[in-house]
Amino acid sequence: FTGILTAAGHSKSTFIATTTGLVLNLILDPVLIFVFNLRVIGAALATILAQIIVTLVFLYNAKNLDLFRNIRILSKPELNHISEILKIGFPSSVQSMLFTCISMYIARLISSFGAISVAVQKVGSQIESISWMAADGFSASINAFTSQNYGAKNYDRVKQGYKTGMLVVGLWGLLTTAVLIFLPGPIFSCFIHETNILPYGIDYLIILGYSQLFMCIEIATQGAFNGLGKTLPPSIVSIIFTSARIPMAILLSHYLGVNGVWWAISISSIIKGTILVIWFILYSKRRLIS
């Protein structure tokens, strides 16, 4: 739904749905984990309930749009469309599946440090999402702008659009980095007030704060690559360095405790953002010549 609606110019619908899920998750996480003492199960239930609500919001919006009214699900699809979709979508789908598997392992590792660490990661990641959700929106815009101008062979506009998008996303990444590093206590205490949990939350936000700029530019650059129809480079970078989180987390957590897991996530994001931006710059210099 997110991809279709954004490509069709209905980004407001996706914003409403994802924001609803984010806010609901922020509320349900501490309630189910601590008030009802469900711990890890509570974190899982919060995510499931939020996802259900997001899906319902998407379905409600979809039935009111002309885009979905004439769809015939049982009609025979055209083979050339299927092959093109697979060519573009397969790398990204593999990337998403592996990311989920890696995240499951990381979550298991985090749970070994206790319920407090699970709660910190759940709430902290929702706070951190102010960064990547905004970057996702700009990534969709860069994707659309890039694909339109690439198809029209306006390569100079492709480059200029990427530079402009990166400037905006970079400024947002710097802002979120500053906020998470210098104001972690006031932000985290808005959601969890227990004094024994707050120091862990502060550590999480500070450590992840260092990677926000790089995560934002990685997401934006992925949108540019996708707009060119080149989904393989972002997938390669993401698969390799997201997979690296597992050995890094195991090694660093041995010395730093759960903070080692946070550092593994943050360091991998910094590396991914740096490499993908360099890759796109080199690619555009070689291939996008007017």
Regions found by a protein language model. Give the residues of each.
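Alpha-helical transmembrane segments of polytopic integral membrane proteins
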Residues: 29, 59-62, 103, 107, ...
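Membrane-water interface regions at transmembrane-helix termini and the short interhelical loops
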Residues: 1-9, 29-41
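Short alpha-helical transmembrane segments in multi-pass integral membrane proteins
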Residues: 24, 35-90, 146-211, 252-290
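Hydrophobic positions within alpha-helical transmembrane segments of bacterial inner-membrane proteins
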Residues: 22, 26, 30, 43, ...
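Helix-terminus/linker motif at the lipid-water interface of multi-pass membrane proteins
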Residues: 31-38, 97-130, 148-149, 186-195, ...
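Hydrophobic faces of transmembrane alpha-helices in multi-pass small-molecule transporters and flippases
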Residues: 12-19, 57-60, 74-105, 109, ...
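Short runs within selected transmembrane alpha-helices of multi-pass transporters and secretion channels
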Residues: 1-6, 14-25, 43-56, 136-139, ...
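Small-residue-rich hydrophobic transmembrane alpha-helices
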Residues: 1-14, 107, 120-184, 215-237
